[in-house]
Every structure is written in C-alpha cells, then in structure tokens.
Amino acid sequence: LGKDRLAGDEIDLISINSSFINAQPLPLPYSGNERIIEPNAYDILIAGWCRYWNDIFGPDLTIEANFIKALIESESRFNPLAIAKNKKSVGPARGLVQITEQTLKILKDRKGEIKDHYIDIEKEELFIPSKNLCAAIRWLFRKREILQKRLQRSPTWVETIVEYKGLGPDLKKNGHRSLKVMNDFLSIYKRYR
C-alpha cells in the first residue's frame, strides 16, 4: 500500500505534462570554456524533475535546477550517451548523471533499502535524458536521507554529492582523487550560482 512506482512510460508522460514543461526556475545557461554540444538542451527536464521530486518529498532544503545542471556537467559533460566503466560489482555508469547498474537495481527493488517511489526502468533507458534525470534526482534524495541519519542533522546538497559520487565520508575514499572530483564539481557549480 502506498508504494509508488514510476515505469518508463509514466516517466515519459510526466515529462510532457504542461506543469512539468513550465516548471521554473530554469537553470542558468552553460558558461564554461569547453566546446559542448547542446549544453542547455536539458534545462526544461532539469527544472521539471527538480520540481517533481521536491513536490514528492517536500524537503527542508529543496534541490535546485542549477545544482543538477552542475552535476550533469561534472558527470557527463552533457553527453546523454556517456558510459563509464566501474568495478564489476557496481556496473557501468550511464547517461547524463551517470547512474550505475547497482544504483538502478536499488531504485527498482521493492524489497530493498528504498521503501517508496521506485524507478522501474531498464539499464538501456538510462541513456534517455528524462529517465536518467528522474532516476538521478530520486537517488540524490535517497543519498541525502542516508546522510541525514548518519550525521543526525540536515545535510547540504553539496555534502550529499560526496555520497552520490561515492567519495566516502569526509572525502577519505580514493585519497587525492576524491578531492579532485569534488573540486571539479564545486568549480562548475560556482558558475551556476
């Protein structure tokens, strides 16, 4: 009872709904120096999915479109077909916000760690921007929930990114690489603020 599940076709329908398409505010336009193909092409989807999940979870600290746009730039440089190899147990990361196979399994598993708002899509669908964004933002809310329990306080979204990127508590995992990954994200995020 009360277990909400979004399948691929429902995600498609939500993302063409007029209130979704007209969600505000849109993220700021890309202003980086890299030559990136269509970096602003996903702005409506970003704003729509931020609003959708903020409405669902009603967090004390809402997730912002600029934050998600910075995350996309740091994860895939706006390439919806990006794929990154990972440890076999985690599986490759796919799409705009680099969702791993392990994460997708968790988002689908009705007997697992999440208790509601499942995302029921196939790994190939992670290359579809709307589905990738839907899953990624849902996963960020889960990561924030885990972090909140551990810290015993309301974490910032930047703190949540450390968890999302798998950099471990206090950036201790992977040594200097963790710091480099976080600094890359923070310098990108700064441009969107």
Predicted regions located by residue number:
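Catalytic glycan-binding domains that act on GlcNAc-containing polysaccharides
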Residues: 4-193
